[in-house]
Amino acid sequence: MIIHSDWHIHSEASYDSRLPIKEIEEKSLEYGFKKIGITDHLNFNDEKFVGDLKRSRELLSNLQKHCDRAVFGVELTPIEKPMFDYIKKHGNYEGYIAPVSQNPYEIELAMTKDELRALGVRYAIGASHWRVDVTGGKELGDDLNACIKEWYRQQMWLVSDERVTVLGHPWYNGRGLWYEDFSIIPRAMKDELRAALLENKKYAECNSHFFNSTLTGEKFRHQYAEFLRELFEAGIPITYGSDSHNSYKPAHVNTEKYLLEVGFADGDIKGIEECDLW
């Protein structure tokens, strides 16, 4: 066993999860995890998502009364700055119309670091999920080259932001656009992202999705494990995230198989150090 903690778990407080906090506690103990990080989504700065985060905090507070393995985190995703500003003014995004722009929209995250800390959050996973460079980016997810360019832009932005502790699921794509062959992502982009992670002293996540999803085949899984190994050998600490949503399965078992094949050993997959928690 080389994975001893899980820093990316979604509880029943997340809009897209039904995973009871009790199941997380019991299963993580069964798996031998020394630390578990609850990282429910804070996609937008609206009342709904802020309310979800407060519920997550309440669940964690109750859990921490008898479980010292649990850490309160959050998952942040890049959103377009004009939408952030609109929500800040109106409280939600109903009626929002994206402005016409010839350039990619500026990026923002839903809360400041001080706001997150005030709620008790101790670390943040920053992760790309959809395009925010153009109007209707969520619906424009099939343009391979545009998506690669936008994911690169977002991830480079995330690793330079003070709120991000861990770069979550690097190069994840919900539609699996480049999942047949990871070499589709230009080598220069991978190299520059690695350099930025190192320069900004960020963690990179080994997400179980890449090794367990039906979207990924054997070729991609081996390529992705090698990518993680390159990050590790460059001096970037690697955390593990199951990214569990609706059930807490032992996804780490299959994930470890691919990590071991590229040279990962016990002690290589890290937890977040206390000095890096808020």
Regions found by a protein language model. Name each.
Residues 18, 119-196, 200-218:
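Divalent metal-binding pocket/active-site signature
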Residues 31, 119, 161-162, 234, ...:
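Structural motif
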